[in-house]
Amino acid sequence: MTEFHSGFVCLVGRPNTGKSTLTNALVGAKVAITSTRPQTTRHAIRGIVHSDDFQIILVDTPGLHRPRTLLGKRLNDLVRETYAAVDVIGLCIPADEAIGPGDRWIVEQLRSTGPANTTLVVIVTKIDKVPKEKVVAQLVAVSELVTNAAEIVPVSAMTGDRVDLLIDVLAAALPAGPAYYPDGELTDEPEEVLMAELIREAALQGVRDELPHSLAVVIDEVSPREGRDDLIDVHAALYVERDSQKGIVIGKGGARLREVGTAARSQIENLLGTKVYLDLRVKVAKNWQRDPKQLGRLGF
């Protein structure tokens, strides 16, 4: 009988390198927020990949970056705490962008603070976005940048190309161990955290670059509708830092907030498996990213 292997894999990389999309592709369900805006992941969400022979627990962290605010510093601290406690670090570098200072900075951080006994796998993401010769050129550049990688694996989370190969590579690097989670469980995040992330993702679609860093979502209340077994009421608040940002989220005559509500409600109904009434309110918490008390109140 084959020995069972299990362990924790942390995906790191600069913002917007496809880490959350890759997590969802590996798990086969939506457990991490995806957006075209950088630094949209706020919590270390664990996705779980099940097999008869192994179990991979994926930790999807915020993008590691040079911090400009207290929130940015806390997010970076979260990343470092996470990869100090994992078996494999998956460094994500996209195929469609040249290696830049941000990538080099992260590699240096891994060299200087990453645990010596942790396996490093480099994942070249978004290979569907460029021709094959550019993928090959990026693989060469990555091998020159990261000389201590156990493997370099090119993948496309969008098309699924080589995702199975990546799973095999990650599983092979795990130690022998038990199944930490029951079969069929895809994440250990509470439903309220996932709901807040889904609302946040819907609110980030098609807005200006500065908004992601200024938008937080708090679930105020979740309760079954009295007399209706098939309906759940979800009340949530979207916090921004300035009145001008409140206008961006709400839109003209509330049109954009209604679009956000429709998109988020559909995702939450899929998550909960039932009909949902979603009530969204937009509030201003001035400069919350730099205020320790407000950061704590908003879940950071």
UniProtKB/Swiss-Prot annotation:
<dbReference type="GO" id="GO:0005576">
    <property type="term" value="C:extracellular region"/>
</dbReference>
<dbReference type="InterPro" id="IPR006073">
    <property type="entry name" value="GTP-bd"/>
</dbReference>
<keyword id="KW-0547">Nucleotide-binding</keyword>
<keyword id="KW-0342">GTP-binding</keyword>
<dbReference type="GO" id="GO:0000028">
    <property type="term" value="P:ribosomal small subunit assembly"/>
</dbReference>
<dbReference type="Pfam" id="PF01926">
    <property type="entry name" value="MMR_HSR1"/>
</dbReference>
<dbReference type="GO" id="GO:0030313">
    <property type="term" value="C:cell envelope"/>
</dbReference>
<dbReference type="InterPro" id="IPR030388">
    <property type="entry name" value="G_ERA_dom"/>
</dbReference>
<feature type="region of interest" description="G2">
    <location>
        <begin position="39"/>
        <end position="43"/>
    </location>
</feature>
<protein>
    <recommendedName>
        <fullName>GTPase Era</fullName>
    </recommendedName>
</protein>
<dbReference type="GO" id="GO:0005525">
    <property type="term" value="F:GTP binding"/>
</dbReference>
<dbReference type="InterPro" id="IPR015946">
    <property type="entry name" value="KH_dom-like_a/b"/>
</dbReference>
<feature type="domain" description="Era-type G">
    <location>
        <begin position="5"/>
        <end position="176"/>
    </location>
</feature>
<dbReference type="InterPro" id="IPR004044">
    <property type="entry name" value="KH_dom_type_2"/>
</dbReference>
<feature type="region of interest" description="G3">
    <location>
        <begin position="60"/>
        <end position="63"/>
    </location>
</feature>
<feature type="region of interest" description="G5">
    <location>
        <begin position="155"/>
        <end position="157"/>
    </location>
</feature>
<dbReference type="GO" id="GO:0005829">
    <property type="term" value="C:cytosol"/>
</dbReference>
<dbReference type="InterPro" id="IPR027417">
    <property type="entry name" value="P-loop_NTPase"/>
</dbReference>
<feature type="domain" description="KH type-2">
    <location>
        <begin position="207"/>
        <end position="286"/>
    </location>
</feature>
<dbReference type="GO" id="GO:0003924">
    <property type="term" value="F:GTPase activity"/>
</dbReference>
<feature type="binding site">
    <location>
        <begin position="13"/>
        <end position="20"/>
    </location>
    <ligand>
        <name>GTP</name>
    </ligand>
</feature>
<feature type="region of interest" description="G4">
    <location>
        <begin position="125"/>
        <end position="128"/>
    </location>
</feature>
<feature type="region of interest" description="G1">
    <location>
        <begin position="13"/>
        <end position="20"/>
    </location>
</feature>
<dbReference type="Pfam" id="PF07650">
    <property type="entry name" value="KH_2"/>
</dbReference>
<comment type="similarity">
    <text>Belongs to the TRAFAC class TrmE-Era-EngA-EngB-Septin-like GTPase superfamily. Era GTPase family.</text>
</comment>
<feature type="binding site">
    <location>
        <begin position="60"/>
        <end position="64"/>
    </location>
    <ligand>
        <name>GTP</name>
    </ligand>
</feature>
<feature type="binding site">
    <location>
        <begin position="125"/>
        <end position="128"/>
    </location>
    <ligand>
        <name>GTP</name>
    </ligand>
</feature>
<feature type="modified residue" description="N-acetylthreonine">
    <location>
        <position position="2"/>
    </location>
</feature>
<dbReference type="InterPro" id="IPR005662">
    <property type="entry name" value="GTPase_Era-like"/>
</dbReference>
<comment type="subunit">
    <text>Monomer.</text>
</comment>
<keyword id="KW-0007">Acetylation</keyword>
<keyword id="KW-0964">Secreted</keyword>
<keyword id="KW-0694">RNA-binding</keyword>
<dbReference type="GO" id="GO:0043024">
    <property type="term" value="F:ribosomal small subunit binding"/>
</dbReference>
<keyword id="KW-0134">Cell wall</keyword>
<dbReference type="InterPro" id="IPR005225">
    <property type="entry name" value="Small_GTP-bd"/>
</dbReference>
<dbReference type="GO" id="GO:0019843">
    <property type="term" value="F:rRNA binding"/>
</dbReference>
<comment type="function">
    <text>Exhibits GTPase activity. Binds RNA but is probably not involved in ribosome assembly in mycobacteria.</text>
</comment>
<dbReference type="InterPro" id="IPR009019">
    <property type="entry name" value="KH_sf_prok-type"/>
</dbReference>
